[in-house]
């Protein structure tokens, strides 16, 4: 009802003293009166280029009226501890087979290296023992024919040094094979010891012992 009276007062249709008195004392009516004038000026095109609006009070009031949201605290859940892959039962079963396959692979690699080394050394020794081809010098010197000369090959290396090199290489190969065999035996003994400890621990479980005594 008051808005209609304010609109009529703004248009000059009525003049109410009580309405003017209320308008001077009521801030809400003053805001409505200002809004009406702004709307009319906008419709007529009488508004300035820059408009100043103070909406801070409305924003603060809207923030205060918003309900407070209560967020429940998050309860951390217990996470399972990561299991090491070495302690998995599947790995305990596969470990002996993997160790044997590894040993076989290492043995094959060592044998291949020995064979290739021996063949390479034999090939080098054969090429070093071949005599040089004779060279015939038939070019004339100072317009005169020179006699044909036959190049004599140099003396071959002594056979004793070559045999010593072969023996030294064989000794090294035998030492490598002996070292590998020793490492393989130590590894197999360690695996057998670990398997025996595992079986002994499985036999000494308290539940199994009590069942055995009750059956007796």
Swiss-Prot record:
It is a single-pass type II membrane protein. Sequentially cleaved by DegS (a site-1 protease) in its periplasmic domain between Val-148 and Ser-149, then by RseP (a site-2 protease) between positions Ala-108 and Cys-109. The N-terminal fragment is then degraded by primarily ClpX-ClpP in an ATP-dependent fashion. Sequential cleavage by DegS, RseP and ClpX-ClpP frees RpoE from RseA. CDD domains: RseA_N. One of its GO terms (molecular function) is sigma factor antagonist activity. One of its GO terms (cellular component) is plasma membrane. Keywords: Cell inner membrane, Cell membrane, Coiled coil, Membrane, Signal-anchor, Transmembrane, Transmembrane helix. It holds the Pfam family RseA_C. The record marks 108-109, 148-149 as: Cleavage. Residues 122-216 are periplasmic. Interacts 1:1 with ECF RNA polymerase sigma-E (RpoE); this inhibits the interaction of sigma-E with the RNA polymerase catalytic core and leads to a decreased expression of sigma-E-regulated genes. Interacts with RseB. Belongs to the RseA family. PANTHER family: ANTI-SIGMA-E FACTOR RSEA (PTHR38104:SF1), PTHR38104. This is Anti-sigma-E factor RseA. It comes from Salmonella typhimurium (strain 14028s / SGSC 2262).
């Amino acid at each position: 009802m008051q808005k209609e009276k304010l609109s009529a007062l703004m248009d000059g249709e009525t003049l109410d003293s009580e309405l003017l008195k209320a308008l001077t004392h009521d801030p809400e009516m003053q805001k409505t009166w200002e809004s009406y004038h702004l709307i009319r000026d906008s419709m007529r095109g009488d508004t300035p280029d820059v408009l100043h609006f103070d909406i801070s009070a409305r924003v603060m009031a809207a923030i205060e009226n918003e309900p407070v949201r209560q967020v429940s605290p998050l309860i951390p859940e217990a996470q399972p501890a990561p299991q090491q892959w070495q302690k998995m039962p599947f790995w305990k079963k596969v470990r002996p087979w993997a160790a044997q396959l590894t040993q076989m692979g290492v043995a094959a690699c060592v044998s291949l290296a020995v064979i290739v080394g021996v063949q390479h050394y034999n090939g080098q020794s054969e090429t070093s023992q071949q005599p040089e081809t004779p060279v015939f010098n038939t070019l004339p010197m100072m317009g005169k024919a020179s006699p044909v000369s036959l190049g004599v090959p140099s003396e071959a290396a002594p056979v004793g040094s070559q045999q010593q090199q072969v023996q030294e290489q064989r000794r090294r190969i035998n030492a490598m094979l002996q070292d590998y065999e020793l490492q393989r035996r130590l590894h197999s003994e360690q695996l057998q010891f670990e398997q025996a400890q595992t079986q002994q621990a499985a036999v000494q479980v308290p539940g199994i012992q009590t069942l055995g005594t009750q059956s007796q």
